[in-house]
Amino acid sequence: MAVALIAKDILKRIVVESVPFSLALKQAFKRNDVSKEDRAIASAIVGCSLRHYIVLERLFKDAYPELESEGIIAFAIAFSNALFIKKLDQDECNALAQYFLKEEELSFADFLAPYLVDKKLVPEEVEIGSFDFLSCRYNTPVNVIKMWNKQFGQMTTSRILKANSKPAPKVLRINSTKISDEDFFNQYPEFEKTDLDGVVLYKGEGRLKNSVVFEKGLAYPLTPAYKELLDDGDVDLLRGFAIYSEYQNDLTDELLARFDNINNIEYIAGSYSAFISTKNALAKANINGVNVYEAGVSSIITCISKPVHTFLVMPDSSRLNLLQVLPDYFLRFDIQKLDELIANQAQALKEASAQVEDGGYLLYLVDTISKKETMGLINEFLKEHQEFTLVRDKQYFPYKKYGGSYYFAVLKKGDND
């Protein structure tokens, strides 16, 4: 039962204590002497429990109204092993769940039995196609589904949810400073060309992280949003490039793939964690030509000595791209903070725009699908700053070829001819 108990402890830390998934795993495996095989099993059961948590919690609460959070967590571990993972002794998992039930209550084994025959998890009383149904089926908060439905319509919302429930496409950015596209495809036929130069899809059968292209630094897993944004944003390091970001991101990989020499960049990290992660990423890549500052959005002006040609703004957002990437993100997303995020995004654009030279570019990138944080925000900015014009914007959807939930906008200051 040791692995089941460890999995329960991990899930409890994630659900009750709000510890991020990867950190909870790391800490648990550090505290316990667990084999590589058992680590994989525990990780799989916890991940599976999280991917079905909304519907599982509903099932358990409907059957056992007095069941508390730790009991729900134990149920989720036992249930996920029985229906999906099937690696642990089920009698031991049942005993783990049974511990949280009263003697007169239906046993966990009897509760579980019907689902082993009919694996339909969404309760019959939930109307098919309703917001509650979609939430249970796709493990997505109802308020997010309602927002998407209002902004994009029922069909697009359904396509987003279906895509998010599947693994994202394996998209990579070729390191153009080390190898040409032609040589890359000649040497590595397991990668497929796309309509974007320098962007490929992995179609091999082996695990992508074991590919030799990583070892040689020839390609990086990276959304093409970075490449398209910087292509259209006329990034010229000699003329000045500034970045404001409030979260850890993969921009360093795009810079490595694009420039032989990376210098004359002012990088403003909007939080201490972003500052540390940026410094570490640059050090790991042996990049020395980037000046990194820690400053809030209202202090951007103090970090820029003169206007730059291109200013990239990556403020915090609802980050709904993470619904597909992280199994626990649905627990951490708080729609009540959306207005606060939008106000901060608007301020970041305003502060950065003042540091763009005439003829220069203001770039905006967020990893989310939310019109108020994307097209709506940019339209409001353009109304108030008529010296800027929109060159291009794009919303990435997870159901399209490259996957992901990113939005970028390229704005030019002054004459756009």
Residue ranges of model-derived segments:
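Conserved class I S-adenosyl-L-methionine
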Residues: 236-247
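C-terminal catalytic and target-recognition region of SAM-dependent MTase-like enzymes
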Residues: 297-320, 324-325, 339, 346, ...
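Class I Rossmann-like S-adenosyl-L-methionine
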Residues: 1-210
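Helix-to-beta-strand junctions that scaffold the AdoMet/dcAdoMet cofactor pocket
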Residues: 259-260, 356-358
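Conserved SAM-binding motif I beta-strand of class I
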Residues: 264-269
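Glycine-rich S-adenosyl-L-methionine
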Residues: 146, 330-354
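Conserved SAM-binding loop of SAM-dependent methyltransferases across substrates and taxa
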Residues: 248-261
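S-adenosyl-L-methionine
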Residues: 270-305
